[in-house]
């Protein structure tokens, strides 16, 4: 069994984001970038399957992104993935998620992967399109928002548990298939220092647009999302401090809630 984990590098949710002057994106310089948290579940699930099952031949981690995205690949390798694929080219930066799915499908279609794992969504754009689109382009079944995964002993199918509106749905799927992970699937382990050092020696195959035959044809007419720009949220108005006696302050608070905040 060959497992592929598709990752994305995103800004750390605790960092301060700066938008480019032209509104075309975010400034990456000085911004802490991390593995998309939902993709962490996918990494850990792939590595756990490899540790548990003798029939897992390899776990490959794949990412689309600039040179900086190699850090996310190294994290996956330190956790336990065997090798990485880094799709990096300036032309890839302009692809929307559906076009990225078409790119990845071209690269992996002949890889013989039995199970493809990725996060159910990304925390920056939050669209969740890539996984389902990739499954469709590869013509394989897809299970989304998975919180439990158990592969059959013979390695031909698996049972997945997924969240659906306050309940859990249990489905059985024949491999090959694609699964998107949700919080609850498994928490990614912290890679140890020795494994971080070993990760530097694991192979990472970097591919540019020139290495992907048929890219223009595959992405032409695919996608439909046009990013018009990024804008910061409007500044919050300053808070008000109510002075005076408590009784008068309460009356003023009620008035403000009723007349200005329209909360009453």
Question: What is the meaning of each model-derived region?
Answer:
Residues 1-264:
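N-terminal glycine-rich FAD/FM-binding segment characteristic of electron-transfer flavoproteins
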